[in-house]
Amino acid sequence: MKRIGVTGASGFIGTALVEALLARGDQVIAFSRGGNLPASLGRARIELLDVTSQGCVPALAAALEGLDAVVHLAGETVAGRWSQAKKQRIHDSRQLGTRNVVDAMRACTAGPRAFVCASASGYYGSRHDEPLTEEAPPGDDFLARVCVDWEREAMRAADFGIRTVCLRQGLVLAAHDGALAQMLPVFRAGVGGPLGSGSQWWPWIHLEDDVALMLFAIDHDACRGAVNAVSPDLTTNARFSQALGHALRRPSLAYAPSLALGLVLGEFAQTLLSSQLMLPARAQDLGFVWRHESLDRALLDIVDPGSGREPRLTVFESSQVVEAALPRVFLFFSDPVNLAVLTPPALDFRILTPRPIEMRHGCVLDYQLRLRGFPLRWKTLVERWEPQTRFIDLQLRGPYL
């Protein structure tokens, strides 16, 4: 049994986390500014304390004394039209709130040994088709700057010996709250569809997996630094819209033009149109297992739980045995140049990626061939790279999507 503090405990993610901690037998101190607290927090010790306020550090330090870990989720919601005052609250609630929590932990005599702080996919800004592992540099738009300041404050805890994890969360999917809850009425009415071009990458994670990853971060000493809290099932906004429409058995063809989104939502619209091809590299390396890895199954679980329905999938499976030593086979098939050897000359296969090509996890390759004189281009991502053993590549663009 552990003693865990959770800030932002009355939010939909915080409430789910507190419920999971209590269910496994942990003691929980739930911090909230007050208001209508969910009944499920009843077995937690409630501290009515605004951790984003000036002067809260002494009271906060007293409450954190003797805890094993703190999960910091408090912060102003980014949803809605952004006024200058709203943007200031978004920034200050994260920077000041995190600073207060870190200062309070530092003031403890026997303080927490682990600190898990929320961050967001906005850290990367809009990056089109660039694969984004935790090593990628930050973006330079408003939310990216907020996340940089947020994580900088959080990582101060590591300077005095507290194991610190920053979870860069994608779109957290739940039926009762968050972005998906706002989308559901529109899609149920049959007027939902892609936003803008729909080609932007939308990193996402089921609420249950988001909470499970927080528990994983609390429990595993090897987990530290930035962690992309997203599903490995990479998806564009257009595919997300199609999958949601299928889960609801409703059409999903009503595009929302970028200009219209900008007029209605202002600067906030850019967060919906931004593209982040986030890879959960660190979580995979640490051995985290997703319960809801597939987008189609995750959406069915949320909108139609217990139905037993399965998403409609067309699967083509093929295998081939090569009678040669594995290192030799790996060397041949992992070299993209050899794709030309395997492709009929009439298709005029070409590699567009500049050479030399360093094959590795996260590597992106561009190809072109011609079919009856028409050029076809596609793009693949090396999703897994285990030298001399195996590799997995995923098509991002091309004729099979």
Located regions from the model:
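Glycine/proline-rich active-site loop of Rossmann-fold NAD(P)-dependent oxidoreductases
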Residues: 148, 162, 173-182, 217-227
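Mid/C-terminal beta-alpha module of Rossmann-like enzyme folds, strongest
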Residues: 213, 220-267, 300-310
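Alpha-helical substrate-binding/gating segment
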Residues: 184-192, 200-234
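NAD(P)H-binding glycine-rich loop region in Rossmannoid oxidoreductase-like domains
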Residues: 40-97
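Conserved Rossmann-fold NAD(P)-dependent oxidoreductase catalytic core, especially the SDR/UDP-sugar
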Residues: 82-87, 99-141
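N-terminal Rossmann NAD(P)H-binding glycine-rich loop of SDR-like oxidoreductase domains
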Residues: 4-24
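Conserved beta-loop-beta element that borders a ligand/cofactor-binding pocket
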Residues: 119, 152-175
